[in-house]
């Protein structure tokens, strides 16, 4: 029996082209393990891939919830909602896409809690791009920990954006048409441009730049700064210690409401404003009103500005 086995082994060695070198099974196993590791290292390698494509008809909501990945939503030709993925580095797991009850969801199947926590301090994720048909309106819920979020020229009913340290940008190229935009970030910045509807932006230490002709602009900050401009019908600004500047290119039609603890707040009104009724108060801060009296002109636009120790300025644009 042993002679037969030796003969078979000799035939194998001869077929392998190395009759004088015996086969080392340990080497074969090691080679297989190395090949497996090498293949695993290519998972998530850089490069854009389409991971999902769904007909837009019937979809009511797109929900993207990731950790350190960047999220971009933009309009495109066609009738499908297309999800693209680009890995930021080797070994990054590709997110999964599911469809349930008219909601398209993009997330990782088994998020790593440890990685999620430390992703606040580092950027190792990839990039998810959602391409939606032009004129297609739905609700969008976008959230990430340290990734940036971008929105380009899309039609939406409502969009809710949340990030911890990432920046949020509603790009000004064509703006977005939305009934409601809600942006929340802690230390990241928020830039919202060329949009209408109701706009709500809340940051803790991040800076805000808002330039839009909104139905209502509600801007909230703790220690970050606010720069806002446009022809919004209603402005509501709330700040603890972060300074705020509001440049009204067109006189609001409803109201201006400013509440501050110690922040300096500057509101500039257009020179052709027909009038207003102002209630400006500060416990220890300075008040500057270039228009003179608290009642100006014939229009009764209500302006309320209140602070404890900050400086309040009402000037002409």
Feature-to-residue mapping (PLM):
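Alpha-helical membrane-targeting segments
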Residues: 113-124, 261
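Non-catalytic C-terminal interaction regions
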Residues: 159, 164-165, 178-182, 187
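Solvent-exposed coil/turn segments that connect beta secondary-structure elements
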Residues: 88, 100-102, 109-111, 135, ...
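Short, surface-exposed interaction patches in beta-rich subdomains
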Residues: 49, 171-174, 179-182, 190-317
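Short linear S-[DN]-x-LW-Φ motif typified by the pepsin-like aspartic protease active-site region
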Residues: 4-6, 15-107, 123-143, 148-162, ...
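Short, surface-exposed beta-strand-loop junctions and turns on beta-sheet-rich folds
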Residues: 79-80, 112-114, 157-158, 177, ...
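Beta-strand-rich interaction surfaces with strong enrichment in secreted/lumenal proteins
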Residues: 95-96, 118-119, 291-294
